[in-house]
Swiss-Prot record:
The lineage of its organism: Eukaryota, Metazoa, Ecdysozoa, Arthropoda, Crustacea. It comes from the Eukaryota. Involved in the melanization cascade in response to lipopolysaccharide (LPS). In vitro, reversibly and competitively inhibits trypsin (Ki=8.6 nM) but not serine proteases chymotrypsin, elastase, subtilisin, thrombin and plasmin, cysteine peptidase papain or metallopeptidase carboxypeptidase A. This is Panulirin. Monomer. One of its GO terms (molecular function) is serine-type endopeptidase inhibitor activity. Contains 3 disulfide bonds. Residues 1-22 form the signal peptide. Residues 23-26, 75-79 form a propeptide. One of its GO terms (biological process) is immune system process.
Amino acid sequence: MKNKAVLMLMALFLVAVTQVHGDPEPSYKARSCTAYGYFCMIPPRCRGTVVANHWCRARGHICCSSPSNVYGKNQLLAA
């Protein structure tokens, strides 16, 4: 019975801490690069401005304000 009470108190504490500090890991879509209409790519391919306050899921990629010619229509038409 004592173990059950301790577990209940621990669960209550965790709920209280989460409520005070908010969501410990915000959802990806809330601050993602592509959700705002930007593009995730490796740094050499970025032809626009690097948008620092949004992030990409892929490691080593940056959030870029405009697509590179490599990923854009020009490359597709030339192929």
